[in-house]
Amino acid sequence: MQVNELFKQSNTILLDGGMGTMLQAAGLKLGARPEELNITDPALIEGIHAQYAAAGSRIVNANTFGASAHKLAGSAYTLEQIITAGIENCKRACAPYGALTALDVGPLGELLEPSGTLAFEDAVAEYARIVKAGEAAGADLIFFETYTDLYELKAALLAAKENTRLPILASMSFEAGGRTFTGCTVESFAATARGLGADAVGINCSLGPKEIFPMAKRLAEAVPGNFPVFVKPNAGLPRADGSGYDITPQLFALQMKPYRALHLFAAGGCCGTTPEFIKLLNGTFAGCTPGRPAHRMPSVLCTPVDTVTVDGITVVGERINPTGKKRFQQALREGDMNYVLEQAVSQAEAGAQILDVNVGAPGVDEPVLMEQVVKALQSVTSLPLQLDSSNVEALARGLRVYNGKPIVNSTNGEPEKLAAILPLCKKYGAAIVGLAIDEKGIQPKAADRVAIARRITEAALAAGIPREDIYIDCLTLTASAQQEDVLATVQALEACKKELGVRTVLGVSNISFGLPCRTYLNTTFLTMAMYAGLDLAIMNPSSEEMMAAVYAYNVLTNRDRQSTKYIARFADRVPASTALAQAAKAAPAASAAETELT
């Protein structure tokens, strides 16, 4: 099989099984570095690879899983020597069978900041060294596997995309509760890895076929039907007596049968599996075609532990923005990060689902500050972030350190803006907000704004950004100054939803600027926009009236099934009118009591 045929197979292909399992059976001593055997005993390693290829593995992983500077510290061999020998051994073994050789890459063995001490860019540099050595040695593809930290996987994927041209398979290990050891969800993994350029996503290790299946099903549902998905389960669970794993090759093959319904790109085994396990999978997946029926992809924004599916109205907190706020501007100039973090925490507590982040203020270094604020925010909140800036460098620095899949606010219809912002969003897997404005300014007519939105949408699609990640802002104009254009915004929003199939966003509070009792206008305009199809409402989540409108709307449109969220939020609250009546009724009684006491 040629590399360019990898994702064009008409049948689910087989991966290999456990390397450590085979080496332990061959007498590998506890604490020894398996990767050094690439040089000290190449015949042993080559023989294991050949057994897997003979069993039907079309992709065989080189013995390079632990080849990192940290894990090889003190070795007599360099990282490059071990990787080169590992790739060459695997290629020799695979050649007679037409199997491909994968550079197998695992976690570095050090925790990244903020959980550990390894800086993100140092991790990227370490992975760059690994993948460049693998490509130079002749690897056909890169196989990142057994990751539990999404941030480390991001570092690995960036290194591979920036330094090689090899196809990339990316896999994480999930526990029985459906999250990795660090709390990452299946959906956050899928959205982030796909966005960063992985060519296939999968699940390996930790559990057996039966336990992994529900998570594999979620993974398949979280990516397009034609996007490759794979699995490499363990041979069940380790036996208590340390004598191996509790699933036989025959039972493993039987438990893998339900995976046929997922139409996987590939399947194999991990810890405890051997060539016999892989050989039996030939029958399990005989005639199984990869690829699932097309389905409408949700728009997902995420951090590792919090996956927000934008399906209907979603609240974006607007308060992390210094515009018109002297205290906020002062905090940014003084580096008062606590003030910024307080805004994040209070909005999260009020019910925001996403946080807008704008740090553009006079007298600050916006790119440096954006990076610092993104890192700081992700240390105190799990909510996804909307990076809000017109400064390309600030967006680039924020996107690079962000852990998960963010949204960028914004670009517009100007060609130079599109050319600057869209490639950034593509590289870092971010969703994009497009303002329906161009070099000619804001158009008063809805049709003209839709025309600009169409150009933005076409440019984003051409840049490789999926339609579900395109958001159009039809621009909220102030009712005090441009009252006649208010309805045009709502009309344009509705047309963008129907004609372009994109998501929509509005800065709701702009509508009331300069007018009294702003909450009345904001809430009414929000309701109009929701009815027209608004997806992201950039607003103040501390506004009880606006949040009530959102929750009530979700009940009345059947999005909040059984009114579960509405009841949870409002069951214990007393309406303002009732509270006033109760206070008025209590007042005379209180006065009478005071009189009696005197």
Regions found by a protein language model. Give the residues of each.
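Domain-level signal for soluble alpha/beta catalytic cores
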Residues: 1-473, 477-598
